[in-house]
Amino acid sequence: MLMPKPESEILAQREGLLADLRAIVPGEGVIADNIALRAYESDGLSVYRQAPMAVVLPETVKQVSNIMQLCDRRQIKVVPRGAGTSLSGGALPLEDGIILGLGKFNKILEIDYENRAVRVQPGVANLAISQAVDDNG
């Protein structure tokens, strides 16, 4: 699978970007170590593998908003990732982009059995949904 060629101007921003991201999400919320990034180089579709510049793991909606504003200002590509179980290639990282890891947003908000609909946060895995509705057929 061919992916877009990374932009060298974006890659050159990496260290400054990491500092700005760490100001928004402190502690272990920014992953930039090459070995740790391997866990994020693909989703459930493992044919394509590419480590992103960084992975950011926000815990609040405000942090998500601040990250998106920062990336917009710096023209950084953002790939949102929920639980990382997709087999469709929906969360394929880019070398000159970041992964916005939304796995901490993992609540099932509403189950509407009558309309066969479930409203969830992006970090909810399909298995969790199946288990939540299993007792009601």
Language-model segments: residues:
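Short hydrophobic/aromatic-rich motifs at helix boundaries and adjacent loops
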Residues: 38-40, 100-103
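N-terminal accessory segments
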Residues: 1-44, 73-77
